[in-house]
Amino acid sequence: MVAGTRCLLALLLPQVLLGGAAGLIPELGRRKFAASSGRPSPQPSDDILSEFELRLLSMFGLKQRPTPSRDAVVPPYMLDLYRRHSGQPGAPAPDHRLERAASRANTVRSFHHEESLEELPETSGKTTRRFFFNLTSIPPEEFITSAELQVFREQMQEALGDDSGFHHRINIYEIIKPATANSKFPATRLLDTRLVNQNTSRWESFDVTPAVMRWTAQGHANHGFVVEVTHLEEKQGVSKRHVRISRSLHPDEHSWSQIRPLLVTFGHDGKGHPLHRREKRQAKHKQRKRLKSSCKRHPLYVDFSDVGWNDWIVAPPGYHAFYCHGECPFPLADHLNSTNHAIVQTLVNSVNSKIPKACCVPTELSAISMLYLDENEKVVLKNYQDMVVEGCGCR
C-alpha cells in the first residue's frame, strides 16, 4: 500500500504542477502551460485543487505558499552547498567537514541575525557583539545534528607580507543569562575559539552545535551568541574592524548581504535519506526487442518558471521527473520488471477479463535537492524523496 501511494504521488505531482492548483500555482502559470499543450483540458474542482495544494505544501513542509520579497537574499554559502550536493559542474571543491555534517541531515537552513540586538559594552583590546538568531521557524520534529556560525574576516593591508604578526583570536560564546541592571555583561559559555592571521580574506566557521541543540531539542531559552575578537598585537594604525561582525556605517545592501554573519543548521526530520552528492546515473542498455507500446519510462520535464514557482524556488529551475506509461501484455517479458503477483494477475486476466491487467508503475524512484525560500524568507536546502522516476515495471 505504501509503495502504491508513493507511485501515485510520483505520477500526480507532475500533473498537479502542470495542471495548476488554486493559490499555489498562479493563474499565469496555468494559462502558460495550457497554451503550450495545444489542447484544452478539463478543470478540476476547487475542492480537488485545494486538497492537492495542502498535500504539496505538506510535502514541502510549508504551511502556506511562500511569497518572498524582491529584497530576499540567498547567501552564497547556500548556493555553493546546493551545487556540491546536486553534482553540478564547477561546484566548489569537496569540503570534508561539510560532507560529514550533511551526511546526517536532509535539511539545511540559514539564518541572518537581528542587527538591532548587537550592542555590548566595549572593553580595551576587544571587540564584542551579541548575535541573536530567531530559530522559531525550525519545525519541532526536525532534529538538529550540527550547526555552525559563519563569520567573514577581511584582509588587512597592514598584514600584507607579514606572516609573523597581526593575529586576532575569535571567541564564540553562548549566552546563558542575559545582562541585567546589576551586570552589564551577560553570563556566557565558550563554544569555539580560533587564532587567525589576517593576511587573507576568508570565511571562518565555528561549531555552535551544543547551543543550538539546547535551544531546539532541550527547550532552553535562546539568548544568542557573543562574538569576541581579541586584538593580540596593539600596533599604531592597525584596524580592528577586519572581522565583519557588524555593519559598516555606509555599506550598500548587496555588499553587506554577501558578507554578513550567518548561522547554518543541519537537521533531519526523520523522512527519507540524508543529503548526498547526486551522481548522474548511467542508462541501462538492454539489447532486447521491445514493443513500442510496452511499459517504459517517458520524458517529463517540470519547469518551475512555467508554473510561477520560480519566485521562491531558487534551484533547480526545473527537473526531469519522468513518468511510466505503457502496456503490460500477456505474457509478461523479463524486461518489464514484473513481480510474481503481476505475472499471476496477468495470467488470470488472459482467461478472465474481469480481473484487470497489471499496471505500469514506477519501480525505482530517486531524490532531488531543492533550494528555496520558506514562508519566513529563510533559505532552505532540503532533500526530497521519490521525485524522479528511475525505473518502470508491471506491478
Curated annotation (Swiss-Prot):
A matching Pfam family: TGF_beta
Keyword Secreted: yes
Positions where Phosphoserine occurs in the chain: S86
Annotated keywords: Chondrogenesis, Cleavage on pair of basic residues, Cytokine, Developmental protein, Differentiation, Disulfide bond, Glycoprotein, Growth factor, Osteogenesis, Phosphoprotein, Secreted, Signal
Propeptide residue span(s): 24-281
CDD domains for this protein: TGF_beta_BMP2 (cd19390)
Annotated S-S bridges: C295-C360, C324-C392, C328-C394
Family annotation (InterPro entries): BMP2_TGF_beta-like, Cystine-knot_cytokine, TGF-b_C, TGF-b_propeptide, TGF-beta-rel, TGFb_CS
Residue positions the entry lists as glycosylated: N134, N199, N337
Signal sequence range: 1-23
Subcellular location: Secreted
Main location: secreted
Gene Ontology terms describing biological process: BMP signaling pathway; cardiac epithelial to mesenchymal transition; cardiocyte differentiation; cartilage development; epithelial to mesenchymal transition; heart development; heart induction; lung vasculature development
An example molecular function term from Gene Ontology annotations: phosphatase activator activity
Disordered: annotated segments: 270-292
Bias type Basic residues, positions: 273-292
Gene Ontology CC, one term: extracellular space
Family from the record: Belongs to the TGF-beta family.
Subunit organization: Homodimer; disulfide-linked. Interacts with SOSTDC1. Interacts with GREM2, RGMA, RGMB and RGMC. Interacts with ASPN. Interacts with MAFP5. Interacts with FBN1 (via N-terminal domain) and FBN2. Interacts with type I receptor BMPR1A. Interacts with type II receptor BMPR2. Interacts with SCUBE3. Interacts with TNFAIP6 (primarily via Link domain); this interaction is inhibited by hyaluronan. Interacts with ERFE. Interacts with BMPR1A/ALK3; the interaction may induce HAMP expression.
Function: Growth factor of the TGF-beta superfamily that plays essential roles in many developmental processes, including cardiogenesis, neurogenesis, and osteogenesis. Induces cartilage and bone formation. Initiates the canonical BMP signaling cascade by associating with type I receptor BMPR1A and type II receptor BMPR2. Once all three components are bound together in a complex at the cell surface, BMPR2 phosphorylates and activates BMPR1A. In turn, BMPR1A propagates signal by phosphorylating SMAD1/5/8 that travel to the nucleus and act as activators and repressors of transcription of target genes.
Designated name of the protein: Bone morphogenetic protein 2
